[in-house]
Amino acid sequence: MRALPLNIGTIHFVGIGGIGMSGIAEVLHMLGYKVQGSDIAEGANVQRLRQAGIVVHIGHDAANLGDAQVVVTSTAVKKDNPEVVAARAKLIPVVRRAEMLAELMRLRWSVAIGGTHGKTTTTSLVACVLEHARLDPTVINGGIIEAYGTNTRMGSGDWMVVEADESDGSFLRLPAVIAVVTNMDPEHLDHWGTEEAMQAGYDQFVSNIPFYGFAVLCVDHPQVQQMIPRLSDHRVITYGFSPQADIRAEKVVMDKRGATFEVVVTNRQRNRSRRAGPFRLPMLGHHNVLNSLAAIAVALEMEISDSVIASALTTFKGVKRRFTRTGEYNGISIVDDYGHHPVEIAAVLKAARQAGARNVIAVMQPHRYSRLKVLFNEFCTCMNDADTVIVADVYAAGETPIEGAGRDALVEGLRDRGHRSVVPLPDPAHLAEMINAIAKPGDYVVCLGAGTITQWAQALPAQLEALNRQPATEGAA
C-alpha cells in the first residue's frame, strides 16, 4: 500500500497540544517520522509528547519551524499565525489535520466514528473490543482513554480506529472502510450553515466507504434513520432500542455502577434473529448503552465472538471527562464531564440520577457564545434533572460576546421556563463556598463544559475539605 514516505522530512504541528493534533503527532512519531510542534501553553498533552521524545515549543514564532518540510494545522489555527505565514513564504506545504489523519488511515483498514455526541466513548469502546479480539488496533481518539492514559494507541494489526471530526467538514476526507454515525443534532452550524447541509455532509461521510465496507447507524435518532434510504447502495447495520434495529438492546437494568443488558441480533439478509449476552457495561446512562451497541455492531460484522465482546465491555475503563469522578467530600460526589451540548447535558444529568444521587447540583460553563445563541432554548430546557443549576460565565474559546447569549441571560431563561433553583456563579473562586452551602451527603455535583471547568472539578474536593477543616485549638501542642 502506498503511504506517506518516511523521508518526507520534519513534520511541524502548529497547536500540537490540541487533543486531535497530539494524537496524530504521537502516532507519526511512533511510526518513525520526525515530528515537532508548538503550542500557546503548557499542558498535559504537551508534557506527554515531550516524554515521548517530541520537541514542543511554547509560543508561536516563525523560528519554531526550523528545518520543517511539512506544516500541519487545525481549524483553531488562524491564517495569520506567524508559523503558517512563514511556512507559506518558504513554499512549505501547509496541511490540515484531517488530511494528515487521512494519510495515516491509508496505512490500515479503518473504522471512523462520527456523530454529534458519543464519538469519543464509541471510538474507545470499538478500540477496546478490537484489542480484546487480539486485532492489535491503532487508535486515534478525541479524548483520553483511561486504559491507555492517552488518546492514542500504536498497534501492529491491520485495523485503525479513529474519531471523525464533523465540526469543519474535514471528516469527508477520511478513507474509512467502516463508518459509524451515533446521532445528528444541530451543531457547528457556523461551518455548515444549515441543518440540511450538515445532513448532506453526513451522507457523504458514509457514502465514501467502499462497496466492501459497511455503515453502522443509530436508528433511534430520527435524522440518522432518515439517512438509510439515501444509502440504499451501501451495506447498513442499524442499532438502538428501537424494535426496528438490527442490533437491539433489551432487558436493560441500570444500577449505581453501570448497565446490564441483552442484545437481539437480526440478520435481515437471512431473515434470522438470535439473542446475545447478557453484557455488562460499567458506565452509567442509556446513552452509553447505545454507544456500546455501536461497538457490538462493528464487532459482530467483523465476526468477533459474543464472549470476546462481553469480556471487553466488562473491563472497559471509560474515557477521561466522561462522567469522571474527581473525588468525594463528606459523602458529596464531584463529577467532571465534557458535556457542552444540551443533548449531552441532559444525558449526563439523567445518568447522575441513575447513579443514585440524593440531589443533583449542575455547575455549567457554557462553551462559545455562538453555540449558546443558536441553541439557547435547548440550553434553557436541558437541566430538568438538576435540582440546582449554577451557571458560570461563557468560555469564549476565542469568540467575542454576543448580546443575549451570556451567563445572566441563561440564568433568566432557565428561570423563565420553570426551573426552581438557578444561580449565577460570580467567579470560579466562589464555587467551593457555594457548593459547601447547599450540598449534602449523597448529593452529586456535576461540572459540565468543554472549557476550564475541568480544573474547577479537579480542585473542588480539596477545596471543600479545606473549608471545613477545623482550625487548630489555641495552645495545643
From Swiss-Prot:
Chain positions recorded as ATP binding sites: G115, T116, H117, G118, K119, T120, T121
GO MF annotation, one: ATP binding
Locations listed in the record: Cytoplasm
Pfam families per UniProt: Mur_ligase, Mur_ligase_C, Mur_ligase_M
GO cellular component: cytoplasm
Enzyme Commission identifier(s): 6.3.2.8
Catalytic activity: UDP-N-acetyl-alpha-D-muramate + L-alanine + ATP = UDP-N-acetyl-alpha-D-muramoyl-L-alanine + ADP + phosphate + H(+)
Family the entry assigns: Belongs to the MurCDEF family.
HAMAP family in alphabetical order: MurC
Name recorded for this polypeptide: UDP-N-acetylmuramate--L-alanine ligase
Organism of origin: Gluconobacter oxydans (strain 621H) (Gluconobacter suboxydans)
